[in-house]
Amino acid sequence: MAYPFQLGLQDATSPIMEELTNFHDHTLMIVFLISSLVLYIISLMLTTKLTHTSTMDAQEVETIWTILPAAILVLIALPSLRILYMMDEINNPALTVKTMGHQWYWSYEYTDYEDLCFDSYMTPTNELKPGELRLLEVDNRIVLPMELPIRMLISSEDVLHSWAVPSLGLKTDAIPGRLNQATVTSNRPGLFYGQCSEICGSNHSFMPIVLEMVPLKYFENWSASMI
């Protein structure tokens, strides 16, 4: 869950988000080291009186500044590719949910159940209850079982949208005429908030997403009550 004046990422709720957080820290460390080295070299150049205006080539230096950046790029690319494969892979999903973006609300369909589908609109500010979040609450939350792989099929009825839940490491474009796939897995129960992350019109800011992750038993009771 985000909080005011937050500088870092939201707490990871899924294995994918944990990997993304580690990759962020890994890349940031490399960027920090490179920036420190460059600033150190610049400070030396500005403070020293020694110059080498007659130097035309330096084979050793050129070799170093060719091989070193290549090695750094490999160190960044390898964990990135690993995470990409993890995000794309889903074997035997326990549940499939189809998500459709509209101007300006979301609709959900549980394809493993008959007639289990609903629309999800933002709750107006004047209807919020104490403790609820402005511009983030919805009238119908999407309820999913925790600790199980869930396949989300995401598309759009009209314009480009993007279904995004930061704490789960999810951001998948909803494109008209195209079906995109995302994997949802939560390590713990709770409410997780997201929003449409693609500018889709005048009410783009009013398309929140609320996932309620619950134990499997509670999900079965909820789905039975909805059918």
UniProtKB/Swiss-Prot annotation:
Cofactor binding note: Binds a dinuclear copper A center per subunit.
Cofactors: Cu cation
Matching Pfam families: COX2, COX2_TM
Any GO BP annotation: ATP synthesis coupled electron transport
Modified residues (Phosphotyrosine): Y218
Superkingdom of origin organism: Eukaryota
Enzyme class: translocase
UniProt-recorded name of the protein: Cytochrome c oxidase subunit 2
UniProt source species: Rhabdomys pumilio (Four-striped grass mouse)
Gene (name only): MT-CO2
